[in-house]
Swiss-Prot record:
PANTHER family: 50S RIBOSOMAL PROTEIN L9. Belongs to the bacterial ribosomal protein bL9 family. HAMAP family: Ribosomal_bL9 (MF_00503). Keywords: Ribonucleoprotein, Ribosomal protein, RNA-binding, rRNA-binding. This is Large ribosomal subunit protein bL9. SUPFAM superfamilies: L9 N-domain-like, Ribosomal protein L9 C-domain. GO terms for molecular function: rRNA binding; structural constituent of ribosome. One of its GO terms (biological process) is translation. GO terms for cellular component: ribonucleoprotein complex; ribosome. The keyword Ribosomal protein applies. It comes from Chlorobaculum tepidum (strain ATCC 49652 / DSM 12025 / NBRC 103806 / TLS) (Chlorobium tepidum). The gene is rplI.
Length: 152
Protein backbone atom coordinates (compact mmCIF):
# COMPACT_ATOMS: atom_id res chain seq x y z
CA UNK A 1 0.00 0.00 0.00
CA UNK A 2 1.25 3.47 -0.86
CA UNK A 3 1.10 5.99 1.96
CA UNK A 4 2.16 9.57 2.60
CA UNK A 5 4.11 10.04 5.82
CA UNK A 6 2.74 12.82 8.05
CA UNK A 7 5.55 12.54 10.61
CA UNK A 8 9.16 11.38 10.44
CA UNK A 9 9.41 7.60 10.84
CA UNK A 10 12.98 6.37 11.44
CA UNK A 11 12.65 3.16 9.43
CA UNK A 12 10.65 4.63 6.52
CA UNK A 13 11.52 8.26 5.86
CA UNK A 14 10.69 11.88 6.53
CA UNK A 15 7.34 13.64 6.67
CA UNK A 16 5.88 14.30 3.22
CA UNK A 17 7.50 11.30 1.52
CA UNK A 18 5.45 8.74 -0.40
CA UNK A 19 6.45 5.18 0.56
CA UNK A 20 5.15 1.67 0.00
CA UNK A 21 4.53 -0.56 3.02
CA UNK A 22 2.60 -3.74 3.76
CA UNK A 23 -1.16 -3.31 4.17
CA UNK A 24 -1.21 -4.56 7.76
CA UNK A 25 1.56 -2.18 8.88
CA UNK A 26 -0.26 0.76 7.30
CA UNK A 27 -3.80 -0.12 8.45
CA UNK A 28 -2.95 -1.32 11.95
CA UNK A 29 -0.16 1.03 13.00
CA UNK A 30 0.85 3.94 10.76
CA UNK A 31 -2.59 5.31 9.85
CA UNK A 32 -4.29 4.91 13.29
CA UNK A 33 -1.29 6.46 15.08
CA UNK A 34 -1.33 9.48 12.75
CA UNK A 35 2.04 8.72 11.16
CA UNK A 36 0.61 8.37 7.65
CA UNK A 37 -2.40 8.74 5.34
CA UNK A 38 -3.37 6.70 2.29
CA UNK A 39 -1.81 7.94 -0.96
CA UNK A 40 -4.82 8.58 -3.18
CA UNK A 41 -4.93 10.78 -6.24
CA UNK A 42 -6.44 13.63 -4.21
CA UNK A 43 -3.95 13.41 -1.35
CA UNK A 44 -1.02 13.30 -3.78
CA UNK A 45 -2.26 16.49 -5.48
CA UNK A 46 -2.70 18.14 -2.10
CA UNK A 47 0.85 17.07 -1.15
CA UNK A 48 2.28 18.65 -4.32
CA UNK A 49 0.38 21.89 -3.68
CA UNK A 50 1.59 21.93 -0.08
CA UNK A 51 5.21 21.38 -1.18
CA UNK A 52 5.00 24.26 -3.67
CA UNK A 53 3.56 26.60 -1.04
CA UNK A 54 6.24 25.52 1.43
CA UNK A 55 8.99 26.18 -1.15
CA UNK A 56 7.62 29.69 -1.81
CA UNK A 57 7.42 30.39 1.92
CA UNK A 58 11.00 29.23 2.48
CA UNK A 59 12.29 31.35 -0.41
CA UNK A 60 10.52 34.42 1.01
CA UNK A 61 12.01 33.77 4.46
CA UNK A 62 15.47 33.32 2.92
CA UNK A 63 15.17 36.64 1.05
CA UNK A 64 14.05 38.45 4.22
CA UNK A 65 16.92 36.87 6.18
CA UNK A 66 19.48 38.03 3.58
CA UNK A 67 18.16 41.60 3.76
CA UNK A 68 18.23 41.50 7.57
CA UNK A 69 21.80 40.12 7.53
CA UNK A 70 22.95 42.98 5.30
CA UNK A 71 21.30 45.50 7.64
CA UNK A 72 22.80 43.93 10.78
CA UNK A 73 26.32 43.74 9.36
CA UNK A 74 26.26 47.52 8.78
CA UNK A 75 25.48 48.19 12.45
CA UNK A 76 27.79 48.59 15.41
CA UNK A 77 25.93 47.77 18.60
CA UNK A 78 26.79 49.71 21.72
CA UNK A 79 26.17 47.81 24.94
CA UNK A 80 26.50 49.61 28.25
CA UNK A 81 27.69 47.64 31.27
CA UNK A 82 28.99 48.40 34.75
CA UNK A 83 32.77 48.19 34.82
CA UNK A 84 35.61 48.74 37.23
CA UNK A 85 38.61 51.04 36.79
CA UNK A 86 40.61 48.37 34.98
CA UNK A 87 37.92 47.87 32.33
CA UNK A 88 36.75 44.57 33.75
CA UNK A 89 32.97 44.17 33.83
CA UNK A 90 30.90 43.45 36.92
CA UNK A 91 29.23 40.38 35.40
CA UNK A 92 29.12 39.53 31.71
CA UNK A 93 27.44 40.75 28.56
CA UNK A 94 25.12 37.97 27.44
CA UNK A 95 23.30 37.13 24.23
CA UNK A 96 20.18 38.54 25.91
CA UNK A 97 21.89 41.92 26.34
CA UNK A 98 22.90 41.89 22.68
CA UNK A 99 19.34 40.97 21.64
CA UNK A 100 18.05 43.96 23.65
CA UNK A 101 20.57 46.28 21.95
CA UNK A 102 19.41 44.98 18.56
CA UNK A 103 15.78 45.50 19.54
CA UNK A 104 16.58 49.11 20.48
CA UNK A 105 17.80 49.58 16.90
CA UNK A 106 14.63 48.05 15.44
CA UNK A 107 15.84 44.48 14.83
CA UNK A 108 14.07 41.73 16.76
CA UNK A 109 16.14 38.53 17.03
CA UNK A 110 15.73 35.78 19.60
CA UNK A 111 18.66 35.67 22.03
CA UNK A 112 19.08 31.92 21.40
CA UNK A 113 20.08 32.67 17.81
CA UNK A 114 23.02 34.83 18.90
CA UNK A 115 26.28 32.94 19.39
CA UNK A 116 29.25 34.34 21.32
CA UNK A 117 32.65 32.64 21.01
CA UNK A 118 33.44 33.39 24.67
CA UNK A 119 31.70 35.32 27.44
CA UNK A 120 32.25 39.09 27.23
CA UNK A 121 33.82 40.14 30.54
CA UNK A 122 35.72 43.33 29.64
CA UNK A 123 35.21 46.61 27.82
CA UNK A 124 36.12 46.68 24.15
CA UNK A 125 35.05 45.56 20.69
CA UNK A 126 33.76 42.05 20.01
CA UNK A 127 32.08 40.03 17.29
CA UNK A 128 29.23 37.56 17.49
CA UNK A 129 27.19 35.52 15.02
CA UNK A 130 23.42 35.63 14.62
CA UNK A 131 21.83 32.68 12.84
CA UNK A 132 18.93 34.21 10.93
CA UNK A 133 17.82 31.28 8.78
CA UNK A 134 18.90 27.75 7.87
CA UNK A 135 22.13 28.76 6.15
CA UNK A 136 22.23 32.54 6.65
CA UNK A 137 24.36 33.96 9.46
CA UNK A 138 25.15 37.62 10.15
CA UNK A 139 28.26 38.99 11.89
CA UNK A 140 27.47 41.38 14.72
CA UNK A 141 29.93 44.11 15.73
CA UNK A 142 29.58 44.83 19.43
CA UNK A 143 31.19 47.66 21.37
CA UNK A 144 31.01 47.30 25.15
CA UNK A 145 31.25 50.64 26.96
CA UNK A 146 31.23 51.56 30.64
CA UNK A 147 27.87 52.64 31.99
CA UNK A 148 27.87 56.32 32.94
CA UNK A 149 31.09 57.09 31.02
CA UNK A 150 31.02 60.56 29.47
CA UNK A 151 31.49 60.70 25.72
CA UNK A 152 34.26 63.10 24.75
Amino acid sequence: MKIILRKDVATLGDAGEVVTVKNGYANNYLIPQGYAIRATEGTLKALETEKKQQARKIELQRTNARELAAKIEQMTLKVLAKAGESGKLFGTVTAGDIAEALKAQGVDIDRRKIHLEAPIKALGKYEADAKLFMDITAKLSIEVEAEGASEE
